[in-house]
Design a protein with these regions (language model features):
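Zinc-dependent deaminase catalytic domain
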Residues: 1-146
Length: 146
């Protein structure tokens, strides 16, 4: 009998896609899922404003001199902040998009052992970090270890 179920990576990436629908960012909807070694979901996160602040979808983006929105907390950071540090150790982060270099540093600092994502970042800045953490891209539903 053939098992037609999605792999764990596909399963959690699909959940990350659904989580991204809660994003309040006008530019890009990002979702992520933080998963323990035994495949239990520890937390989810999406990009949006900090608690109590106005959302970009309501007030527009609050941009700095470089044109980047400073109101938004990234999905990865929202998930990491939702979990006690001892639970994050050796976990896997599934994300709709490749984490930026700032989130990547936080991911490594949090003790997360692996990142699996769908949409690559437009530059290869994270190639530097791939020697410190397992980095997997699902590009066109094909798994590529980086």
């Amino acid at each position: 009998m053939k098992d037609n179920r999605p792999s764990w990576d596909e399963y959690f990436l699909d959940i990350a896609e659904k989580v991204s629908s809660r994003s309040t960012c006008l530019r890009l909807k990002v979702g992520c899922v933080l998963v323990a070694e035994d495949n239990r979901i520890l937390a989810t996160g999406y990009n949006g404003s900090p608690k109590g602040m106005e959302h970009c979808i309501d007030e527009g983006c609050l941009k700095n001199d470089q044109g980047r929105c400073i109101r938004t907390v990234h999905a990865e950071i929202n998930a990491i902040l939702s979990v006690d540090s001892h639970l994050r150790k050796n976990s896997v982060l599934y994300c709709t998009h490749e984490p930026c270099e700032h989130c990547t540093k936080s991911i490594i600092q949090a003790g997360i052992k692996k990142v699996v994502f769908k949409n690559p970042y437009p530059n290869d800045v994270n190639s530097f970090f791939s020697k410190y953490i397992d980095w997997v891209c699902f590009d066109n539903n094909k798994k590529k270890e980086l």
